[in-house]
């Protein structure tokens, strides 16, 4: 699954990669204003669009389903796996990779990154939550333990 992607970079050879994960009903442009406001140098921003259509409004969602029927997020995880591969192929190291997420994107940042078989530079969840607490406890990776987390 290839996620629709928007990118933004400050210079021609950035050394830091940041994945910006939008919230529920957002899209690949929702987090661009954050990047422009921060004006970080040497950064390439990657803004993926969630793969599922939001059921009750415009926009997209990272998780599809309900508590009653169950949740689908396979397309999301598969798409993020491919995005990490792309970022690596562009020459960015895991030590220079950050993930920032807002609301549902913050949830995804925690749920996904803490399952990775390696650590990254950091996670910045903003106004987020952990939806699947028991699953995360059971499935987190000890190899991701060095990933720094800045809760906002």
Set out the residue ranges of the language-model regions:
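Gly/Ala-rich beta-loop-alpha elbow adjacent to hydrolase catalytic centers
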Residues: 100-105, 109
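A conserved short beta-strand
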Residues: 118-131
């Amino acid at each position: 699954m290839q996620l629709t992607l928007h990118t933004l970079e400050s210079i021609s050879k950035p050394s830091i990669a940041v994945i910006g994960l939008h919230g529920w009903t957002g899209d690949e442009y929702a987090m661009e204003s954050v990047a422009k406001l921060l004006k970080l140098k040497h950064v390439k921003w990657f803004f993926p669009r969630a793969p599922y259509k939001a059921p009750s409004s415009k926009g997209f969602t990272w998780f599809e389903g309900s508590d009653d029927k169950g949740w689908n997020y396979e397309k999301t995880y598969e798409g993020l796996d491919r995005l990490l591969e792309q970022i690596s192929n562009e020459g960015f190291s895991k030590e220079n990779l950050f993930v920032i997420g807002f609301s549902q994107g913050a949830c995804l940042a925690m749920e996904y990154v803490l399952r990775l078989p390696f650590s990254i530079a950091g996670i910045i969840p903003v106004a987020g939550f952990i939806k699947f607490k028991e699953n995360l406890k059971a499935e987190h990776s000890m190899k991701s333990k060095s990933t720094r987390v800045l809760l906002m």
